[in-house]
Amino acid sequence: MPRTSRKRSETGFYHVILRGNGKQNLFETDKDRAAFMEAARSSFSRDSVTLIAWCLMDNHVHLIIDDPLDRISTAIQRVASTYAMYFNHTFGHSGHVFEGRYGSVPIIDDEQLLAAVKYVHNNPLKGMGITPDRYPWCSYSEYTSCLLYTSPSPRD
């Protein structure tokens, strides 16, 4: 049975989730997390995708992206394959790093966008009991102090 097509976002905004294969950790060190963010930044820049919010947990990743040109598949595939090559080389593994297809939820309006960003930023609290302001691997601090990986959307 063929799998269903992804739902396209009319707004261009998506909540993307990538999970480690077999619930394995995607990140062992901060160097691994930085490598993932570099892969995301490079791919998104190449595909005109803007990273709005993000959170890197040990075994999964949340990304809120603005993709007005509908390049989500190419962009996420490039991020995942670039990081998988890094991960497998670094840890002497082979095979899949991510579990199946990435998940994506189209965001339909500003209210849902705000809720998705809040959900992503609160993931460390929910998963590890760490408040977003104390967790360095989510974009919360970028919103409060203008740092690091995300950039303003060209639509701003």
Question: Language model features by range: what are they?
Answer:
Residues 2-13, 17-58, 64-66:
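An N-terminal domain-cap segment
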Residues 17, 96, 148:
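Short acidic (Asp/Glu) and glycine-rich catalytic loops that position anionic groups and cofactors
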Residues 149-156:
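Conserved small/polar residues in nucleotide/adenosyl-binding loops
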Residues 67-69, 74-145:
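Basic nucleic-acid-binding interfaces
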Residues 40-43, 123, 147:
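Alpha-helix boundary/capping residues
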Residues 42, 86, 153:
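Active-site catalytic microenvironments for nucleophilic, acid-base chemistry
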